[in-house]
Curated annotation (Swiss-Prot):
GO terms for cellular component: membrane. Induction: Expression is repressed by glutamine and at alkaline ambient pH and highly induced under nitrogen starvation and acidic pH conditions. Expression is also negatively regulated by vel1. Disruption phenotype: Impairs the production of bikaverin. Leads to the accumulation of the intermediate pre-bikaverin. One of its GO terms (molecular function) is FAD binding. The gene is bik2. This is FAD-dependent monooxygenase bik2. It comes from Gibberella fujikuroi (strain CBS 195.34 / IMI 58289 / NRRL A-6831). InterPro entries: FAD-bd (IPR002938), FAD/NAD-bd_sf (IPR036188), FAD_mOase_fung (IPR050562). It is found in: Membrane. Keywords: Coiled coil, FAD, Flavoprotein, Membrane, Monooxygenase, Oxidoreductase, Transmembrane, Transmembrane helix. Residues 427-470 form a coiled coil. Its EC number is 1.-.-.-.
């Protein structure tokens, strides 16, 4: 264990996906840190599956994790979409092309498998303390002091809250705002879900995904390596419940929700009830969502779910957490390089780093939240534009689907001070080609629109001329008939 009185550049509160990602980034770039985790281990068995997409995997590849992750996963390749009557709306294999076209697949992995993979890569194990929750945070002009529930006191230049939706660091930040807030002011629960895992089930193969568009209750699922099925049953609460009042559910309530969709068709040869019969995990929770109002103080900042909590329907929660870590580290590294070698960052520079990070991540976080809400509303067939838009996307060709997907990934950040792998460069090439193709399509669409407008104006002009001639003819019947102008007309 590191000496308790040692000063660090960064204290990380939280040892989940975001916290461990930060630790690995700091080790890669020689940034001193200390990580505090409230549970008794970093290798938690809580939660079910985690979706990893190209934007997150590109960063994990920079950290040397992707090969290990791919050994434990299988890419998603086939996607079935059904309506509430069991009619197949779409079956697409566009996702199966991600690996070859953009360098990384979309894959699902058990949380209890992903975290151990990541934790094995931590070298400075003496800088990690479990069973240590943040009890208090005190900021001064030149450092921040973090005290844990077991009495440990540490100082650092910055404390980063990677401590989830009920973040102690965010609570500290909220208390320092000009108008203090609580999480209830921006995080709520609008639906519940049973997250589950099932043993391999006949009728759904590894690499297949399903989604059902159904009012009030619906189900989505993914298959991972060895046929393990990860699934979510969603229920619309038809109201927004503040975080502090988020409902807690029993096993009986979880079972009741799952049985309500047991008859639902999820693949051509399978109904959800068969998957549920093989379940090994089935836990019902309220699904929190929201973006924090304040992301930082002078020496405290938040990343991951502490800053932006989205629903599982969007499939970007872990990936957005990884992105936020990369942006924070990029800002910190830029400040370090700009300062004189070996000099501690001044208070003003630290403030600038945190403010710049928060400013850059605020809009992507809001966009991620809006997209996850849109997908959730569409899955539950909530009337409105979201349902129409998502269902229209199901009609896209593979080419158009990939173009839109790659455009959505085109602005994703990565670690600027760590070399990209060959796959990372392929990612960049793919999004540049997507940008060029989108620009070409927009240019063509503009030219077509301009041509149509020109043609419309010409047609209107001709019609106006014809109407004018008809009017003249009615006023001068002799002239109209003979072409002779009457004297005095």
């Amino acid at each position: 264990m590191a000496e308790p009185n040692q000063h660090y550049e960064v204290i990380i509160a939280g040892g989940g996906i975001a916290g461990v990602t930060l630790a690995l980034m700091f080790e890669k770039l020689d940034i001193s840190y200390f990580l505090l985790e409230g549970r008794d281990t970093l290798e938690s068995d809580r939660g079910a599956g985690i979706g990893l997409q190209p934007n997150g995997l590109r960063i994990l590849d920079q950290l040397g994790l992707v090969e290990d992750i791919e050994e434990a996963t299988i890419p998603l390749e086939k996607w079935f979409s059904y309506d509430s009557e069991g009619n197949l709306m779409n079956d697409s294999d566009a996702m199966g092309q991600y690996r070859d076209k953009i360098g990384y697949p979309v894959a699902f992995i058990e949380r209890r498998k992903l975290l151990p993979i990541m934790v094995r890569h931590i070298q400075r194990t003496e800088c990690v303390k479990t069973s240590a929750r943040v009890a208090s945070i005190e900021e001064s002009e030149d450092h921040v002091t973090v005290t844990t529930t077991d009495g440990l006191s540490l100082t650092a230049d910055i404390v980063v809250g990677a401590d989830g939706v009920r973040s102690a660091v965010r609570t500290h930040i909220d208390s320092k705002l000009p108008e203090p807030l609580t999480a209830d002011d921006y995080i709520s629960v609008a639906c519940s879900t049973v997250y589950g895992m099932s043993a391999p089930t006949e009728g759904i193969a590894p690499g297949e995904r399903f989604a059902v568009y159904r009012e009030n209750q619906t189900v989505i699922g993914f298959t991972g390596k060895d046929g393990i099925v990860f699934w979510f049953v969603f229920e619309n609460l038809n109201r927004n419940v503040p975080l502090s009042q988020a409902p807690r559910y029993t096993e009986a309530e979880a079972e009741a929700l799952c049985l309500s969709v047991a008859h639902t068709q999820v693949t051509p040869k399978l109904k959800f009830g068969e998957i549920y019969k093989n379940s090994v995990v089935a836990v019902k929770i309220g699904v929190e969502e929201g973006v924090a109002k304040g992301w930082h103080t002078d020496r405290a900042v938040i990343v991951g779910d502490a800053a932006c909590k989205t629903t599982p329907a969007g499939g970007q929660g872990a990936n957005q957490a990884i992105e936020s870590c990369a942006v924070f580290v990029n800002k910190l590294m830029a400040a370090r390089k700009a300062s004189q070698s070996g000099d501690k960052l001044s208070s003003d520079v630290v403030k600038s780093v945190l403010a710049s990070y928060a400013q850059e991540r605020a809009q992507p976080a809001t966009t991620a939240l809006e997209r996850s809400q849109m997908v959730g509303k569409a899955l539950l067939c909530t009337p409105g534009p979201a349902t129409t838009l998502v269902k229209d996307m199901l009609k896209l060709s593979n080419e158009d689907w990939l173009l839109r997907a790659f455009m959505a990934l085109s602005a994703a950040p990565y670690l600027e001070d760590v070399e990209l792998t060959a796959r990372g460069h392929l990612y960049n090439k793919a999004v540049e080609e997507a940008r060029a193709e989108m620009a070409r399509r927009q240019r063509v669409a503009k030219e077509v629109k301009e041509a149509e407008e020109k043609e419309s104006k010409q047609a209107a002009s001709i019609k106006e001329s014809e109407q004018r001639n008809e009017f003249v003819g009615l006023r001068n019947p002799v002239q109209a008939a003979t072409g002779v102008v009457e004297v005095g007309s």
